[in-house]
């Protein structure tokens, strides 16, 4: 009976330790930054080494410290044109962040209400009826909580193909795989986070309907021109002489495609221009974009009750002052990966643009967030869980060993008369 009780106690304590080790990993307990806190030069050097060693394609990075550009670096594939501060990269889903800024500017101008149904503003196309009681609001589309289920499967277009109109893309979107893509509301709007590229195609239409001009022109007039972002465009840019081609993971030039879903994935921009935009969004700038940025950081998309998404941007980790490190990442085939992170507490930021590696920009962004805050970011779940394995196993070994030793030294023995002694 004593052995059974000890065994059950060992299982209980082991389970409690394993759960604690796992939960603690999400608070960064088992992780260490790659350089000391405050060592911006050290982190820049780490970024340089990572890009030089791990990526065979093109890449660029820019580090902002205390509201000023601190460092930058540019790396070119063998035989490729040199990359510089003005080289445009395809940003993939980071495009959504800029689109969301455009939507929030319309809110700032009083032309759009986040809490009105999106169909209230649409005339050229409307979201189909659904079975749920809540309408799809503008804020739902921004925060991926609209209930839309579109499979993320929007296909690319060959360079010799004509792009469909916005209405054609909404009515008959091209799928990237064998599964068709349709706009279906499958969950009660406003109740669950479900990443939706299609929601940003609807926001593209919303911007056009509310502003009265084309999406590309609106972003150009409202964001790019005021910030002197001359190396940013939602128009296909591969004909530009200083646009990076797409590379695969082996450093070979890959086929370039066009995107019909401009608002979700069609932006190309330089590291220098993204630096200008990041600086304009920071508290130190005290501009209308600073107010927009503050409104975008309000948690709107939750997972397991924890803040994951604001109004168009990722909330990577909580800062020391209770705000959020924010920004957006992007990824596309064959090996496009981009990352942008801003810490409003310190007016620091990092921008990493990569073509030739599927996850390197996101990894560097994760290390930057850990270095800035001591917490892992929300995109690093695999790294977080992996960090808990070693302390979990060490703890389990010590727990089991303790119970075994206790059982050994408290086991019944026989005295010289043959009587059991406890």
Describe the function of each predicted region.
Residues 130-327, 333:
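Short, surface-exposed loop or secondary-structure junction motifs
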Residues 65, 69, 118, 234-241:
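Short, solvent-exposed turn/loop segments enriched in Gly/Ser/Thr/Pro and often Arg
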Residues 42, 46, 93, 98, ...:
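Extracytoplasmic/secreted proteins, especially bacterial periplasmic and envelope-associated proteins
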Residues 17-28, 71, 79-196, 361:
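Active-site-proximal loop and beta-strand segments within enzyme catalytic domains
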Residues 84-88, 104, 127, 156, ...:
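Surface-exposed beta-strand edges and their flanking turn/coil or helix-capping segments
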Residues 35-42, 53-55, 59, 83-98, ...:
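Extracytoplasmic/periplasmic, Sec-exported soluble proteins
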Residues 2-74, 255-422:
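Catalytic loop of the DD-peptidase/beta-lactamase superfamily, centered on the K-T-G motif
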């Amino acid at each position: 009976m004593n052995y059974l009780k000890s065994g059950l106690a060992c299982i209980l304590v082991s389970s409690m330790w394993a759960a604690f080790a796992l939960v603690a990993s999400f608070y960064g307990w088992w992780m260490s930054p790659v350089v000391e806190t405050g060592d911006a030069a050290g982190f820049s050097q780490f970024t340089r080494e990572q890009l030089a060693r791990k990526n065979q394609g093109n890449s660029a990075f820019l580090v902002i410290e205390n509201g000023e550009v601190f460092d930058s670096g540019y790396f070119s594939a063998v035989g490729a044109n040199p990359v510089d501060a003005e080289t445009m990269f395809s940003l993939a889903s980071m495009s959504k962040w800029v689109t969301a800024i455009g939507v929030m500017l319309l809110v700032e101008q009083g032309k759009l209400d986040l809490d009105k149904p999106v169909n209230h503003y649409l005339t050229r196309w409307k979201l189909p009826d659904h079975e749920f009681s809540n309408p799809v609001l503008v804020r739902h589309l921004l925060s991926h909580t609209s209930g839309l289920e579109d499979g993320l499967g929007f296909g690319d277009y060959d360079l010799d193909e004509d792009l469909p109109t916005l209405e054609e893309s909404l009515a008959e979107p091209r799928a990237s795989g064998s599964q068709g893509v349709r706009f279906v509301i499958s969950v009660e709007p406003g109740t669950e986070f479900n990443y939706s590229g299609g929601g940003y195609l609807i926001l593209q239409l919303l911007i056009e309907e509310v502003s009265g001009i084309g999406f590309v022109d609106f972003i150009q007039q409202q964001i790019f021109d005021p910030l002197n972002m001359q190396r940013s465009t939602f128009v296909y840019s591969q004909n530009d002489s200083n646009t990076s081609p797409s590379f695969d993971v082996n450093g070979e030039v890959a086929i370039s495609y066009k995107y019909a879903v401009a608002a979700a994935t069609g932006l190309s921009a330089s590291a220098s221009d993204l630096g200008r935009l990041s600086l304009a969004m920071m508290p130190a700038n005290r501009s209308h974009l600073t107010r927009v940025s503050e409104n975008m950081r309000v948690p709107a998309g939750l997972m397991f009750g924890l803040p994951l998404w604001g109004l168009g941007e990722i909330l990577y980790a909580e800062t020391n002052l209770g705000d959020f490190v924010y920004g957006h990442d992007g990824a596309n085939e064959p090996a496009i990966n981009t990352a942008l992170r801003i810490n409003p507490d310190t007016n620091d930021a990092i921008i990493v643009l990569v073509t030739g590696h599927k996850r390197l920009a996101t990894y560097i962004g994760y290390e930057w967030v850990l270095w800035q805050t001591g917490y892992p970011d929300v995109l690093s779940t695999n790294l977080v869980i992996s960090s808990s394995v070693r302390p979990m196993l060490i703890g389990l070994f010590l727990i089991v060993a303790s119970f075994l030793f206790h059982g050994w030294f408290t086991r019944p023995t026989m005295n010289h008369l043959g009587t059991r002694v406890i």
